[in-house]
């Protein structure tokens, strides 16, 4: 029957299991990693199917779903078990159905009853399975292959002692043996291939399957020698529609060979795999999540252009974080002294888009001759001087043309740069950042980096990407999908194609063993690498329940770990259509933080995916909205947009709380959830730890570039710098947790590039010597920004150099940035720890219809009537004057306040002009001033 409608007609159902005969050749065009052996074995041929899809869903041993189709009245269940054919006529399921067994997106499907013994079903699952349907009295037939992920969970993970309870997947070392365990319930055969350190074969061990768990296991003797290994599986794979013999690495790998061709057996607890002093390092403790400040860092960006490294060998490597006197380390020490306490590392797990063999990649410091050794046909091979570096050649080219971006784009495939959002193995450090990527060497180097960052006084955050893999199917860097095809990835309910809404092949963390892999991996990073917290890429593509379970598991080994991530609601999981997502709204109250686009867009301007003039039209409060309209903006429209953005910003400053009270621009008393953000509420958080505030990160244009797109042409250099800093101040002084992009304090530019993920050191440069902010170093790559070239050229021409900053400007910006950080960390009033404190203590002034445009005024009270959180300060007032003129702000008893001593003694002479009078404050243009009232 259909779940919502019983049907009376008799139906029969066919499930067919088959194999095909063919040789298999796979795409060999991807050069980034050494490819694993992939061949097929011969088997019995079957007739071609009339039609094929994957719209059948086998959920439990008894229940199978098919889409409703009135033409298909007869269904037959058939399977081929080694030549033995069985058939059965079935009726629609008419019993009581537990709706929780039916995923939300399948609840319109018809339900059928399957009558097969469990052992028979487990055998059937090792072959091709499909449903054949025919209309009575016709020759019309339809076939649909079967999706079985939920059935696999029921069969192998629903009991108290089955696959998801095993704690030792992968390779486990004991004194006398090495034990291996792999979950592959649909495999016909699994063999362990063992190798020595020279990759010479030493053992071929057939593994044995436990039919209760689907786990294949076996062991070899522990001879105390290095052991590398692979798994060879005989398995039906829907990508080729054949029985394949596939050789792959271990999804539970803890160590790898160079370029991840072989898994490596390792004991992470062995002292030989730890740097000196590993057990003695001091982790930085955080009392409350709101005390965190995250500083987002890319490992290569940190040192790629540092002229003060002790050796070129550490450039772009883990080892650069252990330097003593590099420019980057000196700056990190300054940041720590100011109060930043977390270094957030962009992906550092093993990725599929970086060649780990340094002899096979180039960087800008290499001579053109090396480029020509790798790519003899490259156009630069025709120039006369092959000894000059690629960097030197790029510097000879004009800036306002497409020439530089063309060169950078042409070397993307062979350079050593990528952000790393391309998971290959989840639980091994990436080898391209190691000086030696082979086996345990990369692990020791990674641990040394973590130890060095800890010793500098920071916590270490890992950016993790469990929502997709680099590849799937039979592709070179696919692992999970070779071991249990169509299980670890989320499939379209009709076509069976792997969803790619994230960018790549989406994983299905709603499936038990994918959730387990994520959780087990996180525990390893926290326990064995002393990682202090995790940022989850596209977190809303994962279930809320999976995130809560993972957090609980990690906190069992590290009590003050913190989880945060991207809670964007989109794709095939949007609006909870498959499960309750780990999205912004759903995570409210969990203290799992989500990045808030509300404050971001109010400050920067929205339309992050816009192009051309639409970018320039989209001003934000931090880029001139209403106060500095550019030539494309209608002033009436601008004022209306400002009033909404200002209310959104106020809620953002109050930790984006759903229940925070505010008088809105229409003079109505509303709460944060009643202020609109598109078709969503502005306020969604129930705790300040739910909210991550930012105005710039690795995605999209940098804050500096964003503002240059939008500011009026005649804006002075000085004002551009002040505007940039003021935008940062919104994120820093907001309740919740600040997230800061490395180099934003240096006015960092990527020369307008929207998405720099694979565009090398040229566009991603960060100069810790503060000589350049990397602005106007060439038009950004055509692939991402060609539509914006006309606007960029116009902006550069009409700004007439006012957008070009000096080392003095950069130094000023860096110092004011550090002062802002010190201000935040000087008082817990900026770091209130629950919604009740914020709602009762934080107030906004200059609101409603009569508000002065360009003024956001926030007070935070610590008066006697409240439980005191600061022994020295009884109240503070933060005034953000985004207008181009000085402002006087009426405020009762303002004379009791003084400008914060950090600003009084700081480098900004303008903010020192801020004053408090009997009943008002005075704040200069484009200035954020913090006034305090002592206890």
Language-model segments: which ranges?
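The feature marks proteins involved in alpha-glucan
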Residues: 31-46, 51-53, 98-179, 202, ...
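Active-site-proximal helices and loops of the catalytic beta/alpha 8
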Residues: 205-209, 362-365, 382, 538-684, ...
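C-terminal motif of bacterial Sec signal peptides marking the signal peptidase cleavage site
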Residues: 20-23
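Substrate-binding/active-site clefts of carbohydrate-active enzymes
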Residues: 300-305, 309-312, 316-319, 334-341, ...
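C-terminal beta-strand-rich structural cap/linker in extracellular carbohydrate-active enzymes
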Residues: 226-229, 914-935
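Short proline/glycine-enriched turn/loop motifs at strand-loop junctions of beta-rich domains
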Residues: 68-74, 183-189, 883-884, 894-896
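Loop/helix patches that line or flank the sugar-binding groove of alpha-linked glycan CAZymes
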Residues: 675-877, 883-890
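Bacterial signal peptide processing site
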Residues: 25-27
């Amino acid at each position: 029957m259909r779940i919502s409608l019983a049907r009376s007609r008799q139906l029969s159902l066919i499930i067919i299991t088959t194999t095909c005969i063919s040789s298999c050749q796979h795409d060999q065009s991807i050069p980034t990693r050494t490819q694993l052996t992939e061949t097929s074995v011969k088997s019995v041929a079957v007739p071609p199917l009339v039609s094929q899809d994957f719209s059948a869903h086998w959920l439990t041993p008894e229940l199978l779903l098919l889409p409703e189709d009135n033409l298909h009245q007869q269904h037959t269940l058939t399977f081929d078990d080694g030549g033995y054919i069985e058939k059965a006529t079935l009726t629609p399921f008419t019993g009581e159905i537990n709706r929780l067994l039916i995923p939300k997106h399948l609840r319109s499907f018809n339900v059928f009853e399957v009558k097969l013994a469990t052992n028979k079903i487990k055998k059937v699952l090792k072959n091709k399975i499909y449903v054949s349907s025919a209309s009575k009295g016709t020759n019309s037939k339809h076939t649909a292959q079967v999706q079985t992920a939920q059935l696999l969970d029921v069969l192998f993970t629903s009991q108290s002692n089955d696959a998801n309870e095993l704690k030792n997947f992968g390779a486990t070392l004991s004194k006398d043996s090495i034990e291996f365990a792999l979950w592959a319930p649909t495999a016909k055969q699994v063999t362990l291939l063992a190798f020595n350190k020279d990759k010479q074969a030493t053992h071929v061990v057939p593994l044995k399957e436990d039919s209760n768990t689907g786990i294949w296991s076996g062991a070899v003797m522990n001879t105390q020698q290095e052991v590398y290994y692979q798994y060879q599986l005989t398995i039906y794979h829907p990508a080729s529609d054949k029985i394949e013999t596939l050789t792959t690495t271990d999804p539970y790998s803890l160590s790898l060979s160079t370029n991840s061709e072989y898994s490596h057996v390792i004991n992470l607890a062995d002292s030989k795999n730890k740097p000196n002093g590993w057990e003695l390092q001091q982790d930085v403790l955080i009392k409350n999540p709101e005390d965190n400040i995250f500083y987002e860092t890319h490992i290569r960006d940190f040192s790629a252009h540092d002229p003060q490294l002790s050796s070129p060998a550490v450039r772009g490597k883990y080892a650069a974080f252990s330097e003593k006197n590099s420019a980057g380390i000196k700056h990190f020490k300054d940041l720590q002294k100011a109060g930043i306490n977390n270094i957030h590392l962009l992906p550092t797990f093993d990725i599929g888009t970086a060649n780990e063999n340094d002899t096979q990649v180039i960087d800008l410091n290499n001579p053109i001759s090396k480029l020509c050794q790798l790519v003899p046909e490259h156009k630069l091979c025709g120039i006369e001087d092959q000894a000059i570096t690629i960097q030197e050649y790029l510097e000879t080219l004009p800036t306002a043309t497409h020439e530089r971006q063309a060169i950078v784009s042409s070397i993307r495939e062979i350079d050593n740069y990528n952000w790393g959002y391309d998971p290959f193995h989840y639980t091994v450090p990436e080898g391209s950042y190691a000086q030696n990527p082979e086996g345990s060497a990369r692990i020791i180097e990674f641990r040394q980096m973590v130890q060095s960052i800890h010793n500098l006084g920071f916590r270490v955050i890992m950016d993790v990407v469990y929502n997709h893999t680099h590849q799937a199917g039979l592709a070179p860097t696919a692992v999970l999908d070779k071991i249990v095809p169509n299980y670890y990835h989320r499939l379209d309910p009709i076509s069976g194609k792997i969803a790619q809404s994230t960018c790549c092949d989406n994983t299905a963390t709603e499936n038990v063993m994918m959730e387990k892999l994520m959780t087990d991996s996180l525990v390893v990073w926290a326990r064995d690498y002393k990682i202090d917290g995790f940022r989850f890429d596209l977190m809303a593509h994962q279930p809320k329940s999976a995130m809560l379970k993972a957090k609980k598991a990690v906190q069992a080994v590290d009590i003050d770990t913190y989880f945060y991530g991207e809670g964007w609601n989109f794709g095939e999981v949007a609006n909870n259509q498959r499960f309750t997502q780990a999205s912004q709204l759903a995570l409210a109250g969990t203290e799992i933080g989500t990045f808030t686009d509300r404050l971001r867009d109010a400050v920067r301007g929205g339309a992050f995916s816009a192009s051309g003039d639409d970018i320039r039209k989209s001003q934000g409060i931090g880029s001139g909205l209403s106060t500095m309209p550019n030539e494309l903006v209608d002033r009436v429209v601008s004022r209306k947009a400002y009033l909404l953005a200002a209310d959104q910003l106020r809620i953002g400053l109050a930790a984006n709380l759903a229940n925070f009270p505010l008088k809105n621009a229409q003079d109505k008393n509303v709460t944060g959830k009643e202020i609109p953000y598109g078709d969503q509420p502005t306020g969604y958080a129930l705790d300040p730890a739910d909210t991550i505030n930012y105005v710039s990160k690795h995605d999209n244009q940098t804050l500096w570039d964003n503002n240059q797109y939008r500011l009026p042409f005649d804006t002075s250099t000085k004002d551009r710098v002040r505007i940039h800093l003021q935008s940062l101040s919104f994120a820093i002084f907001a309740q919740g947790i600040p997230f800061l992009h490395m180099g934003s304090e240096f006015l960092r530019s990527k020369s307008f590039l929207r998405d720099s993920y694979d565009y090398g050191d040229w566009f991603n440069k960060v100069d810790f010597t503060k000589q350049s902010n990397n602005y106007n170093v060439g038009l950004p790559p055509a692939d991402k920004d060609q539509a914006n070239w006309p606007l960029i050229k116009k902006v550069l021409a009409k700004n007439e150099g006012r957008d070009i900053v000096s080392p003095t400007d950069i130094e000023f910006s860096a110092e004011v940035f550090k002062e802002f950080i010190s201000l935040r960390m000087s008082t817990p009033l900026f770091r209130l720890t629950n919604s009740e404190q914020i709602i009762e203590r934080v107030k906004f002034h200059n609101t409603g219809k009569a508000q002065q445009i360009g003024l956001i005024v926030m007070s935070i009270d610590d008066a006697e009537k409240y439980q005191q959180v600061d022994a020295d300060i009884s109240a503070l007032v933060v005034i953000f004057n985004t207008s181009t003129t000085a402002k006087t702000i009426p405020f009762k008893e303002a004379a009791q306040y003084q400008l914060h001593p950090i600003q009084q003694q700081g480098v900004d002479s303008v903010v020192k002009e801020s004053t408090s009078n009997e009943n008002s404050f005075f704040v200069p243009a484009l200035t954020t001033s913090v006034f305090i009232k002592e206890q």
